Amino acid sequence: MSNVNMWEIENGVYGEGFEIICGVDEAGRGPLAGPVCAAAVILPKGLEIPGLTDSKKLTDKKRRELFPVIKDQAIAYGIGLASHNEIDEINILHATYLAMERALAQLTVKPDIALIDGNRAKDFGLPVRTVVRGDSLSMNIAAASILAKVTRDDLMLELAEKYPQYGFEVHKGYGTKAHYEALRVHGASEIHRKTFLKKFYGEK
């Protein structure tokens, strides 16, 4: 499948005079446990990566096939995390921005502009444009969505070995029925987001 339509947003931005475009996306805003992960990716203009689209539309197998391809073909990429503690301290929105800042700081090439998935962003020290459903519409954001998702999934698989009673290897920390049942039986672990569990525990 051609990626031609996935370059439309970037092509418009190139037409405005920007030369180096970075895509930014996150994974893990919603889970009850673990970090939020962000990735920033700069792809060569017009690059074709067959099958590349929003990570949520892909199987885990396909994401893992694309992961090394994106890293290999990118001009630059960066990955940043914000921990469960940081999420509890500054809230999930600001923790997401922190993870994005850390991902952008990892780039070895400075972008002229960042395209960020969603409808809100902060000033990251460079021009920023938000793109609603950007992970389905922009090559750079789609690539970032895959790097963020696979990186976070792998971290949750590691945490599943340390905390086997919660089933992180299955739900990656999201609030599934099985996860809530494990919380009822075992209580929260040290890597759970306490602010996300207040309602569950009836706290205010």
Show which residues each predicted segment covers.
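RNase H-like, Mg2+-dependent phosphodiesterase core
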Residues: M1-K204
